[in-house]
Amino acid sequence: MAPITLSTVDDDLKEVIQHLFEIQSAVHGYLGPETQTELVRKIKNLTLALSTLSTHTKPQPPSQDEEQKEKQDDTPEGSANDPLLRDIQLPPEIIDYVDAARNPDIYTREFVELVQRGNQDLKGKKEAFASFRDVLAREMRSAMPECRGEVERVLAATGGARVDTEQ
C-alpha cells in the first residue's frame, strides 16, 4: 500500500463533508417512502467514506521493505507541499485547544508572545553580563596592569569593547 499523504486525507475529509451535506439536504427535503431509498444510499456512501478515512488515518508502521527502500532512495516519498501523514507531528496542546472548541490560532499567538517575553529576558541578561564584563575588565586593567594582555585576550574572545593598550 502506498504511503498516505496529507492531500489524500484532506480529500477524504472533503468527501465526508460533502456526504454529510447531501444527507442534510435529503433529510430537509424528505417526502416519505419515495425519497427513503435515496437517503439510505447517501448514508451508505457516508459510511464508505468514513471507513476510507479511518483506514487512511490508522497509524501503520513502515514495513522492513519500505524502510530499506527509504534508506536506498535519497528522495523523500512526500513532497514539501504534500507531506506524508506519518511525518506530521502536532503538539498535544493544539489538539487540546481544538477539542475544547477553541481556535488553535490563539494557542499560536500565546506561544509566540511567551517566546518573545523569554527572548526579551534573555536579551536583558546578555546585555547585563556584557556590561559587567566590560566593567570587570576595566577594573582589572587598572588594578592589575600585569594582567592587561590576558584581559584584552578575553575581551577579544567574548566580543567586548577593545581599549588601546598604549597608555
Swiss-Prot record:
Residue segments, region Disordered: 53-88
Compartments in which it is found: Nucleus
Q: Is Cytoplasm found in the keyword set?
A: no
InterPro entries assigned: Mediator_Med10
Q: Which GO terms describe its biological process?
A: regulation of transcription by RNA polymerase II
- Determine the domain of life of the protein's source: Eukaryota
Q: Which Pfam families match?
A: Med10
Its cellular-component GO annotations read: mediator complex
Q: Which UniProt keywords apply?
A: Activator, Nucleus, Transcription, Transcription regulation
The coiled-coil segments of this chain are none
Example of a GO MF term? transcription coregulator activity
Q: What is its main location?
A: nucleus
Q: What does this protein do?
A: Component of the Mediator complex, a coactivator involved in the regulated transcription of nearly all RNA polymerase II-dependent genes. Mediator functions as a bridge to convey information from gene-specific regulatory proteins to the basal RNA polymerase II transcription machinery. Mediator is recruited to promoters by direct interactions with regulatory proteins and serves as a scaffold for the assembly of a functional preinitiation complex with RNA polymerase II and the general transcription factors.
Report quaternary structure and partners.
Component of the Mediator complex.
> Which family, according to UniProt?
Belongs to the Mediator complex subunit 10 family.
Q: What is this protein called?
A: Mediator of RNA polymerase II transcription subunit 10
Q: Which species expresses this protein natively?
A: Neosartorya fischeri (strain ATCC 1020 / DSM 3700 / CBS 544.65 / FGSC A1164 / JCM 1740 / NRRL 181 / WB 181) (Aspergillus fischerianus)
